[in-house]
Structures are given as structure tokens and as C-alpha cells.
């Protein structure tokens, strides 16, 4: 019995099956975790006891983005270190002020460009290096970089500010590269699991941002010395990275996880040449090593994910364009009143905490609601509508500004509302896009497709951060 054509094939956790001809019906079925999870012949599907795998993936999601979030949210620390530490009020030369004013943009570019390159590398390594090697190695590198940053917290860098800046950018590039390998490897792993596990991982990423924002606020409130608060900040990140290593090792011991992590035989239906019969080897059979392709077929994956890829690029372009380069430079209209809520805590509250919490809420909603579907024209329409948020943020009290002198929204409530809308839309729509991608291809291509989806995401982040860095000089 022949398989359906490529356009009508959907991926379950363990098999490929003929999708209904009606697109709306197909979308609904593709989103039902239970229906997508057909057990292979001869194997009984185990239950996720006590939601152990779900919790582990959620924690791994936190750990995957925690290093980046901790780097970005430590704004006061970077401002302190990039000035003359012993005399912050002294006159800096124009080059030092340029580094200080546009540091967030430099940091964003340093994180997105290496991320893009290492996503390509990870795509090539999918079938060459085992996933547990990639995960543990990337976590170890991130942990080592944070140890270096912890040591530098207490080092007086006032005599080599530019050298410290270069070292920080290099550390950010390494952190971004290792985090990319970790995130894409774990996200690819969830492609073989039911959809709820991918949702847990993606929601965990938003929780990582929320945790870092809360930790920053607590540190700022509890410590008068920015170095002490940052030391506690970075130590927390290092401890959690170590915890992630332990949790990942624990994951492979769960019966539920072992069931979905077992090897899969190659399926020829996706080659574009012919359609195999359903009598081909089942998904549970183990493929001989000599038959496993070293590099997944990129062309068919790009074809199947073209629409979702456009959505991913557009979504993250807008988000990276606004955060952190634009949003962190929006000041309270009442900054001069002397209140800490309109000065010291304004950016941590209205940008980092609010955005990450709204992002988390948007991602959690996808655990119960998954509309529009992967074939719906409404999905790209909603994504494109987010471009309207860019001018709204620019017309808030962004400082410094030399050319665009008009501040249209002269109330602090506007950046709060815009940030909520940005976070909710980013969380909900990006989660839908990322969990759809690996589910519209055969299971053995799920990990490679996950890497491709993250590649789309990184392209959007890189373009957004680069455009924001350019735009800042014209505002």
C-alpha cells in the first residue's frame, strides 16, 4: 500500500501517516498530541510518570537561554565596567561613549552572527555526533565562560576598558555558539517526542528570561554594590547550568524518554524520488550505521517549512529589532523625580521582567490552544502585523535621540502596553511556528528540521539586531 504524496504526509512521534485531504482537518489532527503519537508495532507507549520528562524539558529550556538572558539583563553592570571604574563621572572620550551607548547592539550582533554559523554546523553534525555529546559539551563550554565572567566581576578593569569590552564580546560569541548547539540539539530531540514536550522546552526558554529578570530586580534591591549583585547573578547562572547537565543525564534514564529516543530507520518517502510502501521497516527498527545518511536532505526540508520559515524570520526580526537595543533605551518620562521606580528599576521592570513574563504567558497558552494551524494563511498575516510595533516603540521616550525629536507617547503606560503586546505575540506565535516545523516531516528528519527552524529564527534575530544597530545612529 503506497504512502500519500509528500504534501499530504504528516509526522507522528513514531510514524508517518496519510493526512486528511481537508487542510483544516489536517491542521487539527496535526495538533492533537495523542493522535500524533501512534505507538510502533510491538511496542507499548509508556506514560510520562509524574510529568518527569515534561519538567526536565522545561528546565532545559530555562538553561538553554539563561546564559544569554543573564548577559543581556546585566545592563547596570556593563555600564559600570565600561566606564572608568574608579571615576565613572569623569569625561570619557567619544569612542568610549560610543561603546557605552550602543553596547546592547554590539552584544546582540555578537550573539546572533555566531549563532547562525553554529546552527549550520549543528545541521551538519546531526548524524555525525551523538546528541548527548553535543548537549554536554555545549553546557560545559557555557559553564566555563561563566566561571571566567565571575572572576572578572571583582577585577578592576578601569585601565583596560576597551580590552574588557573586546573580551566581553568574545565571551558573548562563545556563549551564543554553545547555547545554539545546546538549544538546537535538545529542540531537535523533542521532535521525536509528543508535541507537549517541545512546548515545555520553548516555554522554559521564556521562564529563563523571567527568572533572570526577577533575579536582577532582587539583586538591585538587596545590594548597593553593582559588582556584588552581578556576582550573585552570574553564580546563579553557573549553578543552573550544572543542574541542567544533571537533568539531561537523568532524562535518558526515564523509560518514557528511552522509548522516544530509540533509533529510527531511514524513510525514503522524503527523498522526492518515489514513495515507499507501508510495508517498509517500521520506525522502531534500528538502522544499520552504514545506511544512515551523514547529512540530512536540506532541499525537501526547506520546501516543507518555507511558510513557517518566513514566519520565524519575521517574528524574530521584529523582536530582535526592538529588544534589547531599542527598548532598553526608553526612559521614564519622570526620570528626574528621583524615584528609583522611574530610574533604577524602570528598564528591568518594563523591559526585561514584563517582556519575559508576557512571552512566558503567550507560550503557555499554546499548551491548550493551537490556532491558527500550520497551513492557515492567518498565521503569516498575524506575524506580519507585528511590524507595526517598531514605530510605536520609536515614538516613545527613546534616549538619546538626535534626529527624531518628537516623542509622541508622553506617558510611561505606553511602553508598558507595547511591551506586553510584543511579549504575548512573540511567545504565542513563535511557539506555534517552532512546534509545527518538526511535525510536518517524517520522524527521522525531525531533528534536522528542528535545526532548520532554529536557523530561520537566528536569521531573523541577526537581521533584526543588525538593523537596530544601524537605526540607532539615525534616531
UniProtKB/Swiss-Prot annotation:
Annotated knockout phenotype: Knockout mice show lysosomal nucleoside buildup, elevated intralysosomal pH, altered macrophage function, and develop spontaneous and progressive macrophage-dominated histiocytosis.
Record-annotated site: Important for acidic pH-dependent nucleoside transporter activity. Acts as a pH sensor: 219, 447
Membrane-side (Extracellular) residue stretches: 73-105, 156-162, 221-230, 327-340, 399-415, 472-475
Keyword Transmembrane attached: yes
GO molecular function annotation: cytidine transmembrane transporter activity; guanine transmembrane transporter activity; monoamine transmembrane transporter activity; neurotransmitter transmembrane transporter activity; nucleobase transmembrane transporter activity; nucleoside transmembrane transporter activity; organic cation transmembrane transporter activity; uracil transmembrane transporter activity
Subcellular location: Lysosome membrane; Late endosome membrane; Mitochondrion membrane; Cell membrane
Motif Dileucine internalization motif boundaries: 31-32
InterPro entries with a match to the protein in the record: Eqnu_transpt (IPR002259)
GO CC terms of this entry: Golgi apparatus; late endosome membrane; lysosomal membrane; mitochondrial membrane; plasma membrane
Topological region Cytoplasmic: 1-51, 127-134, 184-199, 252-305, 362-377, 437-450
Major place of residence: membrane
TM spans (from-to): 52-72, 106-126, 135-155, 163-183, 200-220, 231-251, 306-326, 341-361, 378-398, 416-436, 451-471
One GO BP annotation of this record: adenosine transport
Membrane topology, record value: Multi-pass membrane protein
Glycosites: 84
Keywords: Cell membrane, Endosome, Glycoprotein, Lysosome, Membrane, Mitochondrion, Phosphoprotein, Transmembrane, Transmembrane helix, Transport
Catalytic activity annotation: adenosine(in) = adenosine(out); guanosine(in) = guanosine(out); inosine(in) = inosine(out); uridine(out) = uridine(in)
Its biological purpose: Uniporter that mediates the facilitative transport of nucleoside across lysosomal and mitochondrial membranes. Functions as a non-electrogenic Na(+)-independent transporter. Substrate transport is pH-dependent and enhanced under acidic condition, probably reflecting the location of the transporter in acidic intracellular compartments. Proton is not a cotransporting ion but most likely change the ionization state of the transporter which dictates transport-permissible/impermissible conformation for nucleoside translocation.
Further remark: A truncated version of SLC29A3/mENT3 in which the N-terminal 36 amino acids are deleted, enables cell-surface localization of an otherwise intracellular transporter, and is utilized to investigate the transporter activity.
Protein family per UniProt: Belongs to the SLC29A/ENT transporter (TC 2.A.57) family.
UniProt note: domains: Contains a N-terminal dileucine motif (DE)XXXL(LI) important for endosomal/lysosomal and mitochondrial subcellular localization.
Protein name, entry field: Equilibrative nucleoside transporter 3
Organism whose genome encodes this protein: Mus musculus
Gene from which the chain derives: Slc29a3
Amino acid at each position: 500500500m503506497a504512502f500519500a504524496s509528500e504534501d499530504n504526509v504528516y509526522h507522528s512521534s513514531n510514524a508517518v501517516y496519510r493526512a486528511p485531504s481537508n487542510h483544516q482537518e489536517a491542521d487539527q489532527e496535526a495538533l492533537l498530541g495523542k493522535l500524533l503519537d501512534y505507538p510502533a508495532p510491538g511496542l507499548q507507549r509508556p506514560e510520562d510518570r509524574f510529568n518527569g520528562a515534561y519538567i526536565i524539558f522545561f528546565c532545559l529550556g530555562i538553561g538553554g537561554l539563561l546564559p544569554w538572558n543573564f548577559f543581556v539583563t546585566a545592563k547596570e553592570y556593563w555600564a559600570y565596567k565600561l566606564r572608568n571604574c574608579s571615576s565613572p563621572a569623569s569625561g570619557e572620550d567619544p569612542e568610549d561613549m560610543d561603546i557605552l551607548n550602543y553596547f546592547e547592539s554590539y552584544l546582540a550582533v555578537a550573539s546572533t552572527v555566531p549563532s547562525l554559523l553554529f546552527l549550520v554546523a549543528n545541521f551538519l553534525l546531526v548524524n555525525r555526533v551523538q546528541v548527548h555529546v553535543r548537549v554536554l559539551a555545549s553546557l560545559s563550554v557555557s559553564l566555563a565562560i561563566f566561571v571566567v565572567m565571575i572572576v572578572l566581576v571583582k577585577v578592576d578593569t578601569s585601565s583596560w576598558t576597551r580590552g574588557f569590552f573586546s573580551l566581553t564580546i568574545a565571551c558573548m560569541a562563545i556563549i551564543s555558539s554553545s547555547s545554539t548547539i545546546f538549544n538546537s540539539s535538545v529542540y531537535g530531540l523533542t521532535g521525536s517526542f509528543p508535541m507537549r514536550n517541545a512546548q515545555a522546552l520553548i516555554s522554559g526558554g521564556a521562564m529563563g528570561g523571567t527568572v533572570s529578570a526577577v533575579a536582577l530586580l532582587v539583586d538591585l534591591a538587596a545590594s548597593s554594590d553593582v559588582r556584588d549583585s552581578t556576582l550573585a547573578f552570574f553564580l546563579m547562572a553557573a549553578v543552573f547550568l550544572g543542574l541542567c547537565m544533571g537533568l539531561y543525564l537523568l532524562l535518558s534514564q526515564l523509560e518514557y524518554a528511552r522509548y522516544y529516543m530509540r533509533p529510527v530507520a531511514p524513510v525514503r518517502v522524503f527523498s522526492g524520488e518515489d514513495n515507499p510502501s507501508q510495508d517498509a521497516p517500521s520506525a522502531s527498527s534500528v538502522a544499520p550505521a552504514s545506511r544512515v545518511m551523514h547529512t540530512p536532505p536540506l532541499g525537501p526540508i526547506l520546501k516543507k517549512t518555507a511558510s513557517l520559515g518566513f514566519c520565524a524570520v519575521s517574528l524574530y526580526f521584529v523582536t530582535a529589532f526592538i529588544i534589547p537595543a531599542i527598548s532598553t533605551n526608553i526612559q521614564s518620562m519622570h526620570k528626574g523625580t528621583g524615584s528609583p521606580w522611574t530610574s533604577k528599576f524602570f528598564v528591568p521592570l518594563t523591559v526585561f521582567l514584563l517582556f519575559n513574563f508576557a512571552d512566558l504567558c503567550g507560550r503557555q497558552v499554546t499548551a491548550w490552544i493551537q490556532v491558527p494551524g500550520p497551513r492557515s494563511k492567518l498565521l503569516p498575516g498575524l506575524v506580519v502585523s507585528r511590524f507595526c510595533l517598531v514605530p510605536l516603540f520609536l515614538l516613545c521616550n527613546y534616549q538619546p535621540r538626535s534626529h527624531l525629536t518628537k516623542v509622541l507617547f508622553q506617558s510611561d503606560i505606553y511602553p508598558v502596553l507595547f511591551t506586553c503586546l510584543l511579549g504575548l505575540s512573540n511567545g504565542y506565535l513563535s511557539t506555534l511556528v517552532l512546534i509545527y516545523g518538526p511535525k510536518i516531516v517524517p520522524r527521522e528528519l525531525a531533528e534536522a528540521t528542528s535545526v532548520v527552524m532554529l536557523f530561520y529564527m537566528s536569521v531573523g534575530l541577526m537581521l533584526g539586531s543588525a538593523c537596530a544597530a544601524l537605526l540607532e545612529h539615525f534616531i
